[in-house]
Amino acid sequence: TSSEAASEASESSAEADGAEEGTFTVGFDQDFPPMGFVGDDGEYTGFDLELAQEVASRLGLKYVPQPIAWDAKDMELEAGTIDCIWNGFTMNGREDAYTWSDPYMDNSQVFVVAADSGISTLADLAGKVVEVQTDSSAEAALKDNQELSSSFGTLQTVADYNTAFMDLEMGAVDAIAMDVIVAGYQMEQREDGDNYVILDETLAAEEYGIGFKKGNEELRDKVQTTLEEMAADGTMAEISNKWFGRDVTVIGK
């Protein structure tokens, strides 16, 4: 049957595609909710990871979530310890560094500040302490916008955004530059979420995609086809509604 043929095809190519034969190993930052993080039960969860798990299941591969240090993601991919980077991974500015899926989600880089900070525009960030995750898209966007970043009093990096929010809460920093999807989720989940606001002016508009090792079109094509099937049958919208209360995906639209 066609399903048996598809299963055999996926098994025969798994050795070439997988970090280990028959597996689909997804590299992600475990401190990046709601895309990928450690849930209350100690298990890895998140919007991207649920999508990845469904893709693996449909391809007949064993799903393996592999947390990585975000600044070591390229090394992990080149070494073959992961099959892809799938975790709110911005395509913009990295177009030629990976073999990419089509974009599945829009994103923008924004600034989060304390609601009572008196900061309401990008110009108000002049002389302020701004924090950003190391090797993140927000950091890259700030490097591209020297006029803005040079106006800051200090631009400092942090390992993850959970730490950044703690720094903002303590008043150690004045603003965090980060993904709007993640910022909104963090603010919804935090008991003190109403104490923060996202500035209306954005830093950069972007798209999320899945990054594969350069040249691995075979695995990329399988994943892309599966994502398109998930979009068509409503599975992608269902997973999106679970995490965001709406369909934030762009495949097939």
Enumerate the language-model features and the residues they cover.
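Extended ligand-binding regions for polar small-molecule ligands
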Residues: 49-58, 128-129, 134-137, 184, ...
